[in-house]
Amino acid sequence: MPLNFADVGEENIIKKIGGKPEVKKHLENLGFVVGGTVKVINKLGGNVIVNVKEARIAISEEMAQKIMV
């Protein structure tokens, strides 16, 4: 399922990252890698706030849809 559908407080394993190569590279640089864990902290104002690799990051729902967990 896409990351934006994950429940708040739930830790998930990243299974796939979709999108164009430059989008994949950008997400990888932020710490979103296949096999890594990501935890949804909050959802507000069209953004998804997550913990990934011990960092708190806000990404748009559009970006979150490209991350399959």
Regions picked out by a protein language model, each given a short descriptive name:
Residues 1-69:
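Compact, glycine-rich, soluble single-domain proteins
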